[in-house]
């Protein structure tokens, strides 16, 4: 039974991601995260990840874009303005 992914973006400085399965890549300009149904790419500057609970990941820094790729589906991008 898979849980839905929940994203909460606060401006371009903070992203809360619930139901995260695995962090695939992590550096100060790019964080790639796998959830039950998505692969998320977060691009920016001075990015940091903080896991406060096993299911919840907070990403801080200057978030410039978020790319969502459904597993086996089409690719979508949301850019911070």
Regions found by a protein language model. Give the residues of each.
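Mature-chain termini and adjacent capping regions
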Residues: 1-25, 30-81
């Amino acid at each position: 039974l898979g849980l839905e992914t929940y994203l909460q973006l606060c401006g371009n400085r903070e992203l809360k991601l619930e139901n995260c399965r695995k962090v695939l890549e992590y550096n100060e300009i790019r964080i790639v995260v796998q959830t039950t149904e998505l692969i998320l790419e977060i691009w920016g500057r001075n990015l940091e990840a903080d896991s406060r609970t096993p299911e919840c990941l907070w990403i801080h820094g200057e978030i410039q874009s978020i790319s969502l790729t459904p597993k086996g589906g089409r690719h979508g991008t949301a850019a911070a303005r």
